[in-house]
Amino acid sequence: MLYWLLKKWIPPEDRKRVVGNLVTLRMQLDEEVPAKNTEADLLLATWNIRDLGKTNRRGFGERLPETYFYIAEVLSRFDFIAVQEVNELDEWEKITKILGPAWEWIATDVTDPALGGNGERLTYLYDTRKVLFRNIAGEIVLPAKLLISSSVQPSAKDKDTEAVTVDDKPIGRQFRRTPYTALFQSAWFKFEICTVHIYYGDESGAKLEERIEEIKRIADYFGKRAEKSLEDGRSLILLGDFNIVGRDHKTMKALLEAGFEVPKALREAPATNVEKDKFFDQIAFRTRPGDLAYLESAGAGAAARAGAVDIFKRLFTAEKFEDYKAAVEATSNAAHNEDMEAYYLDWRTYQFSDHSPLWVRLQVNDSESYLQDLAAG
């Protein structure tokens, strides 16, 4: 973390408060997330950072410079993070600059807003001191027979690019946001990873069914690689914002029925939306039994092997409204809200996020078992 940028980006009158917030956040992360090390474990996370770099901020105003430091502080506690909702790259590049030169990232191009993808990118961020990119990455494009039933009829403008037609009638479409897959390695652990931001649609009806179908399609399609990948010594990890409603909801069943496993340590992690009642974000595996057994033998605190970071536990709390009152009142939405303190609780999700990071701790050093096998002949 390049903390010297605080002197450059944070006005002197705000610096003491911002540094105090960073110290408080660091203390929280020390309590909740295991310390990074260079040998035994990989800390892997997924985080939907709301409207990062979006030019149209829906009337909530721009992110404050201090927020980039808070986001970077959270990201810095992991070795590898799949990030959703990265739009234009100006804010993202500020955050990665704060992280420092040891960090690298790869990303998709923006999705076409006309296709329902909101102009978003899917992104992988990784600490090069721990993770090696294996030079293969790509977006998943479904063959015609696997296209997703559309809950919304495409316009004539984009019918040719997103739908298969019979007698000029659309019968299917690609993902609203194309899943992004890549190969990485950390020590002995090789993994093929795919991140998603699944279409939300609605809470019921055809749009919910389209959401479920997107989950099924990516789990089935990516899961077909499992046998070959495991033979080659690679684990499959499917993660991101699935917009899964609950652990027993059919959105979750759509993921698990394809053979992916969500370890108990993750199933028992807190909900990742602000209201703490939805399990939108997930990390699922097709991997060796030993990898999952390691996750299941989790403890608490420094011994934890999965969790979710409550980003509003100590920052942007209701009690800190006065610190941000001027910024809140300066937004264009403020004119339409009489209760500024209630509006602030919504505004803060456009500063930090409306999702909590979900993370796991994976064992990546197989030296001992390898040497034992070698000695056994």
Regions inferred by a protein language model and the residue ranges of each:
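Metal-dependent phosphoester-hydrolase catalytic domains
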Residues: 1-31, 89, 224-235, 243-377
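Structured beta-strand-rich core segments of catalytic domains in phosphoester-bond hydrolases
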Residues: 22, 82-189
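Short amphipathic alpha-helices and their capping/turn segments at secondary-structure boundaries
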Residues: 23-38, 181-187
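Active-site-proximal beta-strand elements of phosphoester/diester hydrolases
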Residues: 41-54, 135-139, 190-200
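Active-site beta-strand/loop signature of hydrolases that rely on acidic residues for catalysis
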Residues: 44-49, 74-93, 125, 182, ...
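Stable alpha-helical elements in mature extracytoplasmic
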Residues: 67, 71, 88-91, 95, ...
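Metal-dependent phosphoester/phosphodiester hydrolase catalytic core
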Residues: 176-178, 184-220, 375-376
